[in-house]
Amino acid sequence: MSELTTVARPYARAAFEFAVDSNKIEAWSEMLFFTAEVVNNPTMVKILTSDKTAQELAELFLNVCEDQLDENGQNFIKIMAENGRLRFLPRVAQLFAALEDEHKKQVDVNVVSAYGLSKKQLDELSKSLEKRLARKVNLHCSIDKTLIAGMVVTVGDLVIDSSAKGQLGRLSNTLQS
């Protein structure tokens, strides 16, 4: 995954900077996610791993995408094809989305709770996280009964574990040391 990210990051940044400069962030996001779907198609996977030249791959790819790409999007695909990077488009789209969220001061938050949370609890959690993170929060909730009680909140690499399962695990580690 790290090679994938290392290779995809400069393309995502370049696309994002261009999208911001041309005020077309939403259009670029749609184009990149469409091309990511094309790359993930099983037939296209076979074609991308074949011995076709970069120019043949670019032409074929652009024919498949037809009207989904504007002129700049087509040029982006041609550059990626010339550099043998078309297979990295799904990761480019993901990184582009992360840059878009950062630009919009948004963050995705995963909330795993032992039981379903009420609308009031979700609103309070959202307000609290928005204040702490200084970002607009998009909550993604799920239920895991093995937590016993409480919740685990994950924001990027920040994990806030207030579950009974987590507390019992920490207590066990403390007692064993």
From Swiss-Prot:
Gene Ontology CC entries for this record: plasma membrane; proton-transporting ATP synthase complex
Keyword Transport carried by entry: yes
The UniProt record lists the keyword Acetylation: no
Topology of this chain in the membrane: Peripheral membrane protein
Keyword terms of this UniProt record: ATP synthesis, Cell inner membrane, Cell membrane, CF(1), Hydrogen ion transport, Ion transport, Membrane, Transport
Compartment annotation: Cell inner membrane
Signal peptide: none
GO molecular function: proton-transporting ATP synthase activity, rotational mechanism
Lineage top rank: taxon: Bacteria
InterPro entries for this protein: ATP_synth_OSCP/delta_N_sf, ATPase_OSCP/dsu
HAMAP family to which the protein is assigned, alphabetical: ATP_synth_delta_bact
Annotated function: F(1)F(0) ATP synthase produces ATP from ADP in the presence of a proton or sodium gradient. F-type ATPases consist of two structural domains, F(1) containing the extramembraneous catalytic core and F(0) containing the membrane proton channel, linked together by a central stalk and a peripheral stalk. During catalysis, ATP synthesis in the catalytic domain of F(1) is coupled via a rotary mechanism of the central stalk subunits to proton translocation.
Subunit structure: F-type ATPases have 2 components, F(1) - the catalytic core - and F(0) - the membrane proton channel. F(1) has five subunits: alpha(3), beta(3), gamma(1), delta(1), epsilon(1). F(0) has three main subunits: a(1), b(2) and c(10-14). The alpha and beta chains form an alternating ring which encloses part of the gamma chain. F(1) is attached to F(0) by a central stalk formed by the gamma and epsilon chains, while a peripheral stalk is formed by the delta and b chains.
Family designation: Belongs to the ATPase delta chain family.
Name of this protein: ATP synthase subunit delta
Species whose genome carries this gene: Psychromonas ingrahamii (strain DSM 17664 / CCUG 51855 / 37)
Lineage: Bacteria, Pseudomonadati, Pseudomonadota, Gammaproteobacteria, Alteromonadales
Gene giving rise to this polypeptide: atpH
